[in-house]
Each structure stands twice: as structure tokens, then as C-alpha cells.
Amino acid sequence: MDLNSASTVVLQVLTQATSQDTAVLKPAEEQLKQWETQPGFYSVLLNIFTNHTLDINVRWLAVLYFKHGIDRYWRRVAPHALSEEEKTTLRAGLITNFNEPINQIATQIAVLIAKVARLDCPRQWPELIPTLIESVKVQDDLRQHRALLTFYHVTKTLASKRLAADRKLFYDLASGIYNFACSLWNHHTDTFLQEVSSGNEAAILSSLERTLLSLKVLRKLTVNGFVEPHKNMEVMGFLHGIFERLKQFLECSRSIGTDNVCRDRLEKTIILFTKVLLDFLDQHPFSFTPLIQRSLEFSVSYVFTEVGEGVTFERFIVQCMNLIKMIVKNYAYKPSKNFEDSSPETLEAHKIKMAFFTYPTLTEICRRLVSHYFLLTEEELTMWEEDPEGFTVEETGGDSWKYSLRPCTEVLFIDIFHEYNQTLTPVLLEMMQTLQGPTNVEDMNALLIKDAVYNAVGLAAYELFDSVDFDQWFKNQLLPELQVIHNRYKPLRRRVIWLIGQWISVKFKSDLRPMLYEAICNLLQDQDLVVRIETATTLKLTVDDFEFRTDQFLPYLETMFTLLFQLLQQVTECDTKMHVLHVLSCVIERVNMQIRPYVGCLVQYLPLLWKQSEEHNMLRCAILTTLIHLVQGLGADSKNLYPFLLPVIQLSTDVSQPPHVYLLEDGLELWLVTLENSPCITPELLRIFQNMSPLLELSSENLRTCFKIINGYIFLSSTEFLQTYAVGLCQSFCELLKEITTEGQVQVLKVVENALKVNPILGPQMFQPILPYVFKGIIEGERYPVVMSTYLGVMGRVLLQNTSFFSSLLNEMAHKFNQEMDQLLGNMIEMWVDRMDNITQPERRKLSALALLSLLPSDNSVIQDKFCGIINISVEGLHDVMTEDPETGTYKDCMLMSHLEEPKVTEDEEPPTEQDKRKKMLALKDPVHTVSLQQFIYEKLKAQQEMLGEQGFQSLMETVDTEIVTQLQEFLQGF
């Protein structure tokens, strides 16, 4: 590409690519895509985005194309890689001038320089760091800032490399430039502190921006640049200096008010200081040991004393609390139970912690957390009134403790209470003691204090197990509080029902459950929505609990289910609907079939909710989960849901529909339970199997469920299903077997085995293309035992239950192997006998014995030659299945199922599904469960004797080991 002529053309196309008109935009994008691999294209882009007279949008696009080009074509091994000559020119051009006037473009240029640095620095680009260091010293404000911005992005990128050689290079870089980085940061920080007193906002903002960038560089160097940072005086000097700098910056917040343009940058800088400490503690806990005392003193004074008044802000308090939490909970600082087994570093850190966390300090922290930070704020109470659903969602967990004040204070309380429970338990018990009896509804402060203390008692439930008689407290104090219906008492009604939910799995006598259910029924009718939602949560925890008893719950089931359904209709937010649906699902799951009389309203409502939730895939997932439990609870009656259920399954499992990304896993589970509980096949249920072929092509983690679904169809209606879908299914299986794991192969073959078991005549015909693959695997002695076992299971079914098909298969394989049929059969029997030990399932072992015995009687010399092996397998099978009757002393086949008896289902067991019943009926037709192996052997040997005559038969029996013959005779006594 000639630069001069090309620049004009590329500039024109880039201009077209910024157009809003797709007719202009699309051809331009196509042209740029073609140029991506042209030599010289990136040099042209560099010329364009460094030309400040051109349109900003065009320059922005040029930078983006350059950045993408680095990702795709900068590496030497990449297809269409840039030449070394062009890369040298580009590297030089990128760091010639740091004078980009537009902030967004400057950031993108800094990022792309960092991307090149990741690949080329320092080996191919040794001049980058020295150039940056010189450039950040210049007096020109713009150049200095842009160089500093680039310096930060380069440092950040190099710090993120993880290979050992790259880490070593970064360590070398860090030790070489750390002093300079420190002095640079100190210079900009001092400048900023001087500017603050001047009141010049522009100058303050400019110097603060440089302070922030230089601190970002130092953070990466400090945290990632040293193996043993505590041995480096500059590093430890910088870290110790942070506390003084933090005080200075916090004091600045008095003069830089919340409405000042610099306020946001100031708070970001203060937070960045705390991030340096948190990151360093996380990466180098033992190097942090000299900083433990100072960190705790600093954080506790600003968060729990008047020192912080007027200067702290929420995010800073959260960071300080996280610092305390990380020191308290740090496993590196916890000695072993046997102190002698702990390292000196651990003991040193532990000693510092213990010296700091004295009884007065812990007591004050605990009291301040509860009486100050746990109190519901004005903002929260306003939100409760104006947006009750938003208020309940605000309280969600996850990682919110890292960023939000309330979750952060609660997690800190839990960790400190756990670590120092012997000290803090009496403190909390004393706070509880002072709050006995009802609270005056007119005294809002007293109500909020009680709410905060109850919150603490709930959070510390496990630690207070031995110290609180919760059952008595529930009866005498908590239950009466739930009955106070005054509107101003609602924070306590909500808190008490939440508190019970926290204790339910810790300590709550089973006999008290009915009293709790009564209270829940009342609270689900509370006037306040927040109270109702919290009550639903506690109901879920109660129903989920290990000691839940259905018989205690059933008297309240109708009322609770009706009230939960009303709550589901009343709430409007997606998250709240999901939450209430999960509670409903949980109830349905626990009571199972007992739910049937009460689900009519929910069944009518779910289609409407499904339609309304078209844009909310997570809510649809919750609906799918509810449907799964509904189908399981309804059993065969779930057939009445098909007009709604089957289209839902169809959409959720259709990989051509975008929602499948969210819905597929739950959709497959719903499909499976629908099949398992279906009393009979319907055309619509059969039709949705069209979704299966693309699912099998995905080869995802959902394959196992897909195989279960296919089995479900085979058990439900094998003939109709196989005639409709077996050809396509067989093709999918053949493709899968080429590329799937060993475990996956076994799953595929188990489906085939099931088809042969359910339909011995049609099955082998439909899966005919797979059977040569199985036969070949047996003959060649498949090395994985679990695969070989499955091969023999499949072949055993064909040999035993479809002899004519086996003969045609043997004939086909003889042609393929270019062998005589008899010779091939002999090889197969020999391999079967040799690998019998691969089969571990008793059913398959009996099947093998029956299958090989089915070859008798025979005058075929090959079969007679293998007679000894067949008898060996048969006797092994007898050992597997025969049990001795202690009364008569005779043997009987324990696998025989003579009649269909419905097993009694205990309360804890799930009733049998329709599929379970189908499997039972199938077993009653399966030779493995209907043919006595003992009888079968006797009849086959008798027939062989009649065919050969006494003398010929005796000669045959003499080929069998005498010990085996003795065992056989013992099993056949009485015949």
C-alpha cells in the first residue's frame, strides 16, 4: 500500500463507515475487512488517527481497527501476520508524540500501545519504558498526562502476564523503575495538596488526575512486581506512607465538598489507596504483617470512632471494613490447634491481632456495628414505603459485601463474632436482655434498635447455639411480637419472621412447627408487602429444613398455597416473582402428590405469566423450575397441562431460538419429567422430539439429559417412536460415536441396549448401522472395560432375542473381515469368554450366560469347540444369581420376577412415576427376569445330550474343568 495514495482512499472508506446509512456503511465495512491483511494498512491507520485535523469519529474508528489488528495479526505465528519492518515503523510512530487532545481517543491509544507492549516489550521494544519515563517528566501538561496514562496501561498489562518468564521480566522492570514511580507519585501528590489551598478547581483537577494515574502505576508495581516485597525498603516505605497520605486526602474532603467537580476524582483516589492495601494483603499476607497494627488502628478509628465524622463516605467505610475483615479472617494468620505446628510468620501475625483486639476494642466494635450500622436508615425506610419490592431485592447476597455498606457490615459482624465468640457472646446476650417484652410503637428509635439487635442474633445463630434457649424465646417473646399488628411495628414483624428463618435449621423444636405455620399463615395476610415477602422466604427455609415433616404441614397447606399464589399475583417486579415462584416450587416439591387439589389456580396463571415474561428469561427459568415440580406432583394428571407444557418445552429446547441459551437446561429437565410422568404418548409429545437432533450435535454438558429423554421415549412408545425417529437418531449416534468420550460412548450404547430390550424385533433393524461397530469392537477386544461391557450387553440382546438378525449380522461381518462365519463366531465367543470379567452388573452377566447358551444345542464344531467357555460363563452366572433357600437347601434364581406387586411407599420416598411402572412391566417380559438360568442350562444341556448321544455328550463335558462340572452339578440338583 503506497501511503500517500492509500491514505486518501482509506480515509474516504473510514468516513463512509461512520455513516448512519446502512447502504453506505455495509460496503465500507466489507472493504475495511478486506484491507485488514494488506501490508501498509496499519501504517495508514496510524497516520489517520494521529492527524488531529480530521473528524473525531473517523479517527476513533481508525484507532479501533488498529486495536483489533493487533489482536489478530501482530503475533508472528498469526495468519497474515504483519511484517517485522512494518511493526518496527508502527512501534516508533506510536510513541513519537503523546499529544492526543481527545480523552477517549487518548485512552484507546494507550490501550493499544499496552497491547503491543504485552507481545513485544521488552525484547522487541526496549525503548518503550525509557521513552515513557522521559515523557512523564516533560512540562507540557497534555503530553505529561498522556504519557502517564500510557505508562499506567502498559504497567497494568505487563503486570497481568502469568507465565514464569514474563513474571521474571516484570520483576526486573518493577525493581528498575520503582524509585522513579514513587518519586513521581510523591511529586504529583504534593502538587495536588498545594493546589487545594489555592482553590483553583482546574489546577486541582489536573494535578489530582496525575496523582491518581501515578498511584495506579504504583499499585500494579507494588502488588505484582516483587516476590518478597517486605524485603524492599522503598515498597514498605510507600505502604507505610499510605496511612498519612490517606489522612491528608480525607481532610481535603472537608474543603472539596460533594458538589465540587473534583469530588469524584478525590473519592476515587482515596478508594485507590485502600485498594493498594487490600490487594497487597490478598497477594502477600506475610509481607503485610508489619502493616497489620497500623491498618487496624487506622480503619477502626475512622469507622468506629468520631475521627471519621465529617470526612468519611460510604465506599471508604466499606473498604475499611473489608480491610478489617480480611485481617480477621485471613487463614495465613490463623495458627494450627497445636501452636508448635504453626510457622513463625503466622504466630507473629496472630500475636499482633490478639494484641489489638482487646475486650474493650471488640466490645466497642460489636456495639457500634449493631447500634449504628445495623440501624435501618431514613433512605431505607423511605424505600420500604415507596418501593417495597426494590427494598427486598436490595438485601440480596453474593459479593455485595465487597461494595455495599449493609451487606459489608453484616459480613464483618459474622466474621468477628465467629473469631471472638467467647468474648462477644455475653455482649450480645446483654443487648438481648435489655430488650425483653414489647416495645412502644410510638418510640421509633427503640423499634429500630430492637430490629438491629434481632438482626445480630439472627446472623450469629450458629455461634449462639449453646447460649440461647430459642424455643422458649420463640414462645414467650417472638410469637407475641408477631401478633402486634400496628403499622409502625412492621419492621419488627419482618425482622422476627426473618430471625426465625435464620434459627430454623440451627435450633427449633419440631413440636413448635405448627405454631410457626399458624404465624406464617397470618403474616402472609399482613398489610405490608415487605412483611409478606419476608414471610415467604422463611416459609421456604422451614420447608427446606431437614426436620420438616409433611404431616405437620398438611393442615396448613391449602391456606399457605392460596396465600403464596395471591402474593405471586400481587408482586410486579421480575426478581420478586422469581423469588415467590421458588417458594411455591419448594412447597410443591416437599408435599409432592398432596399438592394436587390446590394447584388449579397456579396452573391457570402460569401461561399468562409465561406470556408476560417474554423479555425476562430468568423469570422464565423460575417458571420452568415450578413446572418441573408441578409435573412431579401431578404425576399422570400432568397430561392435562400439555396444551401449555409442550409449547414451553418446544421453545426452551429449540437451539434455533435465542432464549434457549437461558432456558435449555431447565427445559430439558422439564421435558424429561414430563416423559417420566406421561401415561401415554400423544402426537404433540412425539413431535417435539424434532428438537433433539440439533441438541445432539451440540455435544454439550446436557447430553446425559438428552440420552435420558431418548430412553424416556423408548420406554413410553418404542414402536411409534422408533418408526418415526430411529433413522435420524441412528445417524446422530454414528456421528457422536466418532468424536465422543468413552463415557459418552457408553451412554449412547446404553440407549441402543434399551431399544433392543424394549423392542427386540424392531430395535436391531432400526439401529442396524451401529451394530457392526459394536461387533467389531468385541472382535478387536475393546480395551476399556466399561465400553466392552456395554458392547457385550448390546450383542447379548441381539443374540438372545433376535437370532435371525444375529445370523444376518454375522454374515455381513464375515464378508467385512473376509472370514468364514463359523470362524468369526468362534472368535467372538472366545473374546466374550475372555472378557466376561469386564462385566460387573449382575443383569448383564446373566444376559451373557443366556445369550451364549442360546447357541446350544449345536452340532457346529466351532460352537462345540467353545463349549467349555460357554459352560464356564454359565457357572459364573449361576454364582451371580443363585441364592440358597435356607429352609429347603435348594437354589433359586434371585433375578426372577414372577408377579407385579406395588411396593409400599413410605412418607420419605417418592411414589413411582409412570416410567417406573413401565420399567417394571418391561422387566416382566425380559428374559433376564423371566427365564431361570438354572432351568435354561439344564434344558440346553439335555438338548445337547439328545443331539450328540450319551457318549458324544460325555466327551464334550470332559473338555470342562472338573471343579466347574462339580459346581454345575451342585446347582442343578433336583433336575
Swiss-Prot record:
Residues bearing PTM Phosphoserine: 343
Name of the protein described by the UniProt record: Importin-11
Subunit structure: Interacts with UBE2E3 and RPL12.
Job of this protein: Functions in nuclear protein import as nuclear transport receptor. Serves as receptor for nuclear localization signals (NLS) in cargo substrates. Is thought to mediate docking of the importin/substrate complex to the nuclear pore complex (NPC) through binding to nucleoporin and the complex is subsequently translocated through the pore by an energy requiring, Ran-dependent mechanism. At the nucleoplasmic side of the NPC, Ran binds to the importin, the importin/substrate complex dissociates and importin is re-exported from the nucleus to the cytoplasm where GTP hydrolysis releases Ran.
One biological process term in Gene Ontology: ribosomal protein import into nucleus
Gene3D superfamilies listed in its UniProt record: Leucine-rich Repeat Variant
Tagged with keyword Acetylation: yes
MF term (GO), any: small GTPase binding
Keywords attached to this entry: Acetylation, Cytoplasm, Nucleus, Phosphoprotein, Protein transport, Repeat, Transport
Segments annotated as HEAT repeats: 123-160, 209-248, 318-356, 422-459, 473-509, 511-548, 555-593, 600-636, 640-677, 683-720, 743-764, 765-804, 819-849, 850-887, 957-974
